[in-house]
């Protein structure tokens, strides 16, 4: 990840590194110093390199102290012993930075490249949004009535709007919402995230908005007695619960991956494993066999990738962030299951369908 970027002798001096311990220093996008990963915990780093100005050789030093949780980096840059820059950066600074994008080498013309270019153009075109939205309406109309299909599409848009709001909160530019038949929707941004906290908030805000909408629909159902709103509330809750499954690229996969990949202590990993096991057991006890099975699959996927977590460019969650993210996720899942459970006990065959699917 990019830890630091400052002006140094008229060019950009960039420091990249990871929790694994490796660090690289780039001046004007040229590698000038690096340190390999170390088995020992290390907070202080010293990078020394030489630059030339005309016939003059300049001896440069970059002293860095890194604290990962809570994140804080303190730096001091000198040239021939003269102080050039010093300061510090915290999590907020990392969140607001624009990640460095390496310059790609020019490629010769190829059919694959032409197809890729066409797909990118199609992806950014407004026409594809209309086409996907129309296909989604047709798909849901085939399963339900046109009125229910349009209402369900509105629920999906509200879910994706939650992601959009989170992206804008972090100052990210968004490209809009794409509806995908039978799979839901997709909110896209032109920019990349820098921290695990951004990943958690952006991922979880979609289902969180979905929960709010289901609660509103429940209240409308209690007031009017119209089964239409009951059906919309339970199916909206089901779609958002499905999105919280701990499987990438679903929202739940991003949330749980960010939480588990931010843990370094044996106690934290043990608690994370026990929570996953407890979730599986509870799912089967509640008759949510499908949810329990997918929880096992998602947990195994995270376990297999966990050892490579230090090489990620994302700044990990601190302990407070891990606790808040875990409580937010569990509370959200529990609330959505409670809504599905409530309507399943009504005796209506259609309202029982989401619960039956989860129990298969």
Label every model-predicted segment.
Residues 2-12, 17-22, 35-56, 63-360:
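Hydrophobic transmembrane alpha-helices and their immediate loop junctions
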Residues 25-32:
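Amphipathic alpha-helical segments
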């Amino acid at each position: 990840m990019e830890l630091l970027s400052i002006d140094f002798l008229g060019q950009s001096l960039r420091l990249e590194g990871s929790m694994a311990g490796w660090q690289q220093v780039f001046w004007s996008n040229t590698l000038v110093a690096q340190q390999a990963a170390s088995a020992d915990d290390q907070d202080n780093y010293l990078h020394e390199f030489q630059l030339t100005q005309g016939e003059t050789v300049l001896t440069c030093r970059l002293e860095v102290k890194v604290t990962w949780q809570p994140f804080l980096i303190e730096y001091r840059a000198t040239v021939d012993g003269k102080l050039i820059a010093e300061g510090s950066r915290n999590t907020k600074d990392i969140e607001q930075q624009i990640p460095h994008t390496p310059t790609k080498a020019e490629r010769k013309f190829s059919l694959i490249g032409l197809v890729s270019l066409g797909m990118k153009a199609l992806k950014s075109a407004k026409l594809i949004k209309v086409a996907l939205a129309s296909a989604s309406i047709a798909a849901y109309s085939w399963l339900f009535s046109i009125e229910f299909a349009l209402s369900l599409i509105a629920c999906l848009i509200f879910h994706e709007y939650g992601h959009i709001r989170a992206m804008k909160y972090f100052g990210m530019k968004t490209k809009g919402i794409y509806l995908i038949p039978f799979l839901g929707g997709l909110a896209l941004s032109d920019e990349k995230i820098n921290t695990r906290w951004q990943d958690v908030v952006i991922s979880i805000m979609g289902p969180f908005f979905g929960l709010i909408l289901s609660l509103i629909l429940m209240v409308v159902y209690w007031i009017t007695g119209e089964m239409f709103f009951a059906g919309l509330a339970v199916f909206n809750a089901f779609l958002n619960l499905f999105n919280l499954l701990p499987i990438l690229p679903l929202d739940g996969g991003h949330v749980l991956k960010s939480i588990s990949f931010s843990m370094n202590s044996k106690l934290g990993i043990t608690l994370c494993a026990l929570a996953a096991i407890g979730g599986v057991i509870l799912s089967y006890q509640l008759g949510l066999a499908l949810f329990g099975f997918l929880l096992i699959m998602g947990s195994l996927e995270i376990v297999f990738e966990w050892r490579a977590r230090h090489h990620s460019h994302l700044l990990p969650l601190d302990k407070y962030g891990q606790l808040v993210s875990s409580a937010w996720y569990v509370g959200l899942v529990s609330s959505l299951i409670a809504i599905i459970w409530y309507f399943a006990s009504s005796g209506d065959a259609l309202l029982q369908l989401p619960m039956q699917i989860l129990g298969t």
